[in-house]
């Protein structure tokens, strides 16, 4: 049930999903940990236990939690952060008019009511999860993640059936806190967890873990408001978004972001270049390192968990895009390309990259190294410009790692299916197995309005090949700013892609939900089918369009086939008949031959052509 609390500002969706209960699992190394999951109850006639699933929705789906958007979420990680003894509080920078696009009066979004003093690393310290992992420290965040990734399972007494092709990924039967630490230490996974975003519930991005998805939100200069964007965030995580990127490009960027972060249980990412551009009135040529640096600190103090930095767009690569069908389609990439050409010099993002690392390590802001030269059409896929930038991102990854900064790499884009695996293989090779984070890719260019589907195909494939996080695409891609409905469609599409990838990789727990739903389907437990689905509301609605009565919820057919042509009902009849007449013996008789009608010996005697 989606409950809207009208007294809150802004209004957000709360309430449990159907047949679902919020449960928590305690820690062992850190007994005070309470790791949230969702338990889906099944009908008593099933004789099956509840199905436990990963839950990124935060307190919004917990009926026991009182939501107060004006106060923000509980500061879950605050005590963990301070207990490490390597951070200090300070006054922070003053909010300036340009931070909100010079909005004033009624056009200015109200400040978030609660002001928190920002934290930063003490002098000479790195407060990143990578630094802790390299030092051999298993943090509370790491144990929290291990429990989450196991979907509530205890260490298996016997190995689960593994069925899949992992393409070199090493997904263990059971994730331990030490495994999490080692993957982070090796740079194969990141934990986006800014010390100024203690409200976030720890999660991990890496190819040896569950495939994650990101949802983009954000206002534009044309439309949307703070209330709409906060609700989009809550709505996105309700349906399974693991992270959210605020890509606001209009006014009030600072204040809108504060409302989002304070109420977000998932990591928040941004593209700082967008806000920096607003500060210079949208004139790319007027951007400076000083404006950009100030923006990084502003956002780090607020609690942004990962920055998209387009530092791989170099002056020498821009001519490589001239003969493309669609040129440079990345907003950040085009902004930096314009700046480089105007000043005829190397990007300040590239030249000041080590200083950017110093800022990120002081707050534990992870890098999402942007693919500013990604292909915007399948004609441009895997071209010289795209792969030249990827090589540079590999070089920048090593610099960031040397500074104890966490890194993931952004990828395309528009890529036909036969060229997708080359992207994954090359990224693993040149970026040292840093996590890959891709936008789709879209596998064809002919379907505006359906690009959630064209990209979902590519997302499932590249997720199987090893991409750690998939950035959703909505039906509005290339057409307009997504609304609440588009956000849900994009998230569900990408949850399908991510889950399909987990199944194909042979993740040990991935099939539990599939098998439970398949059994419910075969046994005509309609309510269980609805409740186990990624979108129970839509599944129930589609069923009830033609069979709306409660009696139909126990019927052994649906409107597609009716009672006489239902294959599963016929299968039940066949089983019953088999038990009655002892056809098991007949099946055994022909099992070796594999032909129900003619024994192998008779087949061998039959002349060809008869």
From Swiss-Prot:
Its EC number is 4.1.99.17. Substrate binds at residues 216, 245, 274, 310, 330-332, 371-374, 410, 437. InterPro entries: ThiC, ThiC-associated_dom, ThiC/Bza_core_dom, ThiC/BzaA/B. It is an enzyme of class 4 (lyase). Pathway: Cofactor biosynthesis; thiamine diphosphate biosynthesis. Its cofactor is [4Fe-4S] cluster. GO terms for cellular component: cytosol. GO terms for molecular function: 4 iron, 4 sulfur cluster binding; carbon-carbon lyase activity; zinc ion binding. Gene3D superfamilies: 6.10.250.620, Radical SAM ThiC family, central domain. The keyword Transcription does not apply. One of its GO terms (biological process) is thiamine diphosphate biosynthetic process. Zn(2+) binds at residues 414, 478. Keywords: 4Fe-4S, Iron, Iron-sulfur, Lyase, Metal-binding, Plasmid, S-adenosyl-L-methionine, Thiamine biosynthesis, Zinc. PANTHER family: PHOSPHOMETHYLPYRIMIDINE SYNTHASE, CHLOROPLASTIC, THIAMINE BIOSYNTHESIS PROTEIN THIC. Catalyzes the synthesis of the hydroxymethylpyrimidine phosphate (HMP-P) moiety of thiamine from aminoimidazole ribotide (AIR) in a radical S-adenosyl-L-methionine (SAM)-dependent reaction. Homodimer. Belongs to the ThiC family. HAMAP family: ThiC. This is Phosphomethylpyrimidine synthase. It comes from Rhizobium etli (strain ATCC 51251 / DSM 11541 / JCM 21823 / NBRC 15573 / CFN 42).
């Amino acid at each position: 049930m989606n409950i809207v609390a009208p007294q809150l500002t802004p209004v957000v969706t709360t309430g449990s999903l159907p047949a679902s209960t919020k449960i928590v699992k305690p820690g062992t190394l850190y007994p005070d940990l309470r790791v949230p999951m969702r338990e889906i109850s099944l009908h008593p006639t099933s004789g099956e236990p509840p199905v436990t699933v990963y839950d990124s929705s935060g307190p919004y789906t917990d009926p026991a939690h009182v939501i107060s958007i004006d106060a923000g979420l509980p500061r879950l990680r605050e005590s963990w952060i301070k207990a490490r003894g390597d951070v200090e509080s300070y006054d922070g920078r003053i909010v300036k008019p340009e931070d909100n696009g010079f909005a004033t009066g009624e056009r200015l979004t109200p400040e978030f009511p609660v002001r928190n003093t920002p934290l930063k690393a003490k002098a000479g310290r790195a407060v990143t999860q990578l630094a802790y992992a390299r030092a051999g420290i298993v943090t509370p965040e790491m144990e929290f993640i291990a429990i989450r990734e196991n979907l509530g399972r205890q260490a298996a007494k016997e190995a689960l059936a593994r069925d899949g092709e992992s393409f070199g990924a090493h997904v263990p039967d059971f994730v331990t806190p030490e495994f999490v630490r080692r993957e982070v230490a090796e740079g194969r996974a990141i934990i986006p967890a800014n010390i100024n975003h203690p409200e976030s519930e720890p999660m991990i991005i890496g190819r040896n873990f569950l495939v994650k998805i990101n949802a983009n939100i954000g206002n534009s200069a044309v439309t949307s408001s703070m209330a709409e964007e906060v609700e989009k965030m809550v709505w996105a995580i309700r349906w399974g978004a693991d992270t959210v990127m605020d890509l606001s490009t209009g006014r009030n960027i600072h204040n809108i972001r504060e409302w989002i972060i304070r109420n977000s249980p998932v990591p928040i990412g941004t593209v700082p270049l967008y806000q920096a551009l607003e500060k210079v009135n949208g004139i790319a040529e007027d951007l400076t390192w000083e404006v950009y640096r100030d923006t990084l600190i502003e956002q780090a103090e607020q609690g942004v968990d990962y920055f998209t930095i387009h530092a791989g767009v170099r002056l020498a690569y821009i001519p490589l895009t001239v003969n493309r069908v669609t040129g440079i389609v990345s907003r950040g990439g085009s902004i930096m390309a314009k700046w480089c050409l105007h000043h005829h010099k190397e990007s300040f993002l590239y030249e000041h990259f080590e200083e950017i690392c110093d800022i990120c390590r002081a707050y534990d802001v992870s890098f999402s190294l942007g693919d500013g030269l990604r292909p915007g059409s399948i004609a441009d896929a895997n071209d010289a410009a795209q792969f030249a930038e990827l090589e540079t991102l590999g070089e920048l990854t090593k610099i960031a790692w040397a500074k104890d900064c966490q890194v993931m790499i952004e990828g395309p884009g528009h890529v036909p299916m036969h060229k997708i695996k080359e992207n994954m293989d090359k990224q693993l090779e040149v970026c040292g197995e840093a996590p890959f984070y891709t936008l789709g890719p879209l596998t064809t260019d002919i379907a505006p309005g359906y690009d959630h589907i064209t990209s979902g195909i590519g997302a499932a494939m590249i997720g199987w090949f090893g991409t750690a996080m998939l950035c959703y695409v909505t039906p509005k891609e290339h057409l307009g700013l997504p609304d609440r409905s588009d956000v849900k469609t994009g998230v569900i599409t990408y949850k399908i892609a991510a889950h399909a990838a987990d199944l194909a990789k042979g993740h040990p727990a991935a099939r539990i939900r599939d098998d439970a739903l398949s059994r419910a389907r075969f046994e005509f437990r309609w309510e269980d089918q609805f409740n186990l689905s990624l979108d129970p509301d839509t599944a129930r609605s589609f069923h009830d369009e033609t069979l709306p009565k409660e009696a139909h919820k126990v019927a052994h057919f649906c409107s597609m086939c009716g009672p006489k042509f239902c294959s599963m009902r016929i299968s039940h009849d066949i089983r019953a008949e088999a038990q009655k007449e002892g056809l098991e013996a007949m099946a055994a008789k022909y099992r070796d031959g594999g032909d129900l009608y003619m024994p192998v010996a008779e087949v061998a005697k039959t002349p060809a052509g008869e």
